[in-house]
Amino acid sequence: LDGSVSREFVSAEVVELERRVPDMDYLTECDNRVWGCSNKENVIYACKLGDPTNWFSYRGIAADSYAVTVGSDGAFTGAATCMGYALFFKENTLHKLYGSKPSDFQLSSLRCRGVAKGAARSLCVINETLYYLSPDGVMAWDGSIPTKVSTALDPARLRNVKSALGGALDGRYYLHLVRGNGEAQAVRLLVYDTERGLWQEEDVCSYEMAGSGGQLYLWDGKAIWAADADREENWQQAGGIEDGVSFELVSGNIGLDSPEELYLSRLTLRLEAEVKSRIEVAVSYDSGAWETLAQLTADGRRCFDVPFVPRRCGSLRFRLKGRGQLTLRSLTRTSAAAKGGILAQEVN
């Protein structure tokens, strides 16, 4: 049925010709083949080389279709391609297929934390590493064993998701999560900086995502947003750029690692406002109430040095809260002996 041969014949009976396609749950493309997995049959399929309409061509050549039965328990939860491998996930298993033709295709299975149910669309490749949501949190797979990258997040809020959607831009992993139903539904947009290992939570505007290589577009059900508006030539006419985004940064406890004969005598913050911003700097001593230290305003790009002398305490935390865009460039601590005199050097 490839159109290379034409024949005519007359038959008294009706002749039916069909080209069957397996009933598959998840698909991915790898090496000019479409790969898919079937939960009904527990089978992984590959189409004929370069022909996604032909799944049962077995002529003994390198372009043949391919199928293999897997022995792992449970349903498939996702599929992806990374570093030349076709990958198929279950919640506790990773199946990896590699090879150049059906005669040397090999299946390798690994018992590990796989893709969570309902999180098939969280799979996203960034800089040769595959990120996805597992039942235990967000994982990163670089070709060996998946490692957890979401230890800084509350694991309870990453479990039992209804749906998860992933996207990427400039080394950042965008993860949109939906948990619960109706009024109890909780929606979050998490962003992971893969180079710095930092997580942040952004305003939700991404029920759907699509990347173009140099931009990530997010659909909120009413409008399309660009993750980086500066890359859009006509963003000013769009009338929808976000400005004055609210932010809040709270540090961990400072001073718990100091020996008893030293105390924190001075703390200096160096801040840089990227755009028009309002900033409030506050401090909390020994987990007490927040006390405002300074309120800053920037009409554009500007740097601030905020020094202050903390009162004697066991530990303190500081908070940066405001609206706009702010970067904490450095944190300098100065310690002194209990009897006076500066001893320690700066620590950034």
Where are these regions (language model features)?
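Beta-propeller and closely related beta-pinwheel folds
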Residues: 11-165, 198-200
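Beta-sheet repeat architectures centered on beta-propellers
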Residues: 114-121, 125-129, 135-348
